[in-house]
A protein has these predicted regions:
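Single conserved hydrophobic/aromatic residue that forms the stacking wall/gate
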Residues: 1-7, 11-12
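Alpha-helical scaffold elements within enzyme catalytic domains, especially in hydrolases
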Residues: 4, 18, 66-67
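Sequence-pattern detector for short linear motifs
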Residues: 6, 23-26, 72
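Asp/Glu-centered strand-loop micro-motifs enriched in Gly/Pro and often flanked by an aromatic residue
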Residues: 8, 30-35, 44-53
């Protein structure tokens, strides 16, 4: 790293002392890739996949392959992708949900490693109100249908404060299809809670899909 630093000689010496004294250490991509021609120095690239086949295949798969090729770690939100059973107007069919696409992403990480230095690294995020959340939480299990498993990537569940309140009160929680609640993913705090309650009322009235289950069992 020192050989590719720019600036005064004093700055280079100060940085070297930090490294030598083990008071500071750069991320793995920086250590691996400094002074190389193409590889990335950032630990992770964040992205969001929208609810369209174009976004899923281009942003969620193809572009991630290029970033992984040059040693970039990946972290992305897949909440906007509609859940299993959702109606697809363009084909008059039903969605298979987010899980099969995450399986593709997992295999892409295996196929395109980080510049041959280490395996691809990625993490997919899903919010707790998404209809596929239970299958999502099973993705890394060693049992079950391997076509619905992703052993080579990490998963993370975004949990809103409202879910914790419902859990503490032993109340119910409602799952939605993300294409029917398109703004929920962009809200947080009191704005999220207000909108979530509104969508629950719509689900009770049969205006949108809603699956109710205990917040804690």
């Amino acid at each position: 790293i020192t050989r590719c630093l720019v600036g005064s000689e004093m700055c280079i010496r100060d940085r070297y002392r930090l490294y030598k004294g083990r008071r500071f250490c750069s991320s793995t991509p920086t250590l691996f890739n400094s002074a190389t021609h193409h590889s990335q120095l950032s630990s992770c690239y964040l992205y969001k996949v929208d609810d369209s086949i174009e976004s899923i295949m281009q942003r969620g798969i193809a572009e991630n392959a290029y970033l992984s090729k040059w040693a970039g770690g990946l972290g992305g939100s897949w909440t906007a992708v509609r859940g299993t059973g959702s109606y697809i107007q363009g084909t008059n069919g039903e969605s298979q949900g987010v899980i099969p696409f995450l399986k593709l992403h997992n295999d892409q990480l295996v196929a395109v490693n980080q510049g041959g230095k280490r395996r691809g690294s990625g993490c997919a995020y899903l919010e707790s109100w998404h209809t596929d959340i239970l299958d999502f939480l099973d993705l890394r299990k060693n049992t079950g249908d391997d076509r619905r498993r992703a052993h080579d990537m990490n998963t993370a569940n975004w949990i809103p404060d409202l879910f914790m309140k419902r859990m503490e009160a032993r109340e119910d929680w409602t799952l939605f299809r993300s294409n029917e609640v398109p703004d929920l993913h962009d809200l947080y705090g009191s704005a999220f809670e207000q909108r979530y309650h509104e969508y629950e009322e719509k689900a009770k009235n049969g205006e949108i899909f809603g699956k109710t289950m205990p917040a804690i069992e």
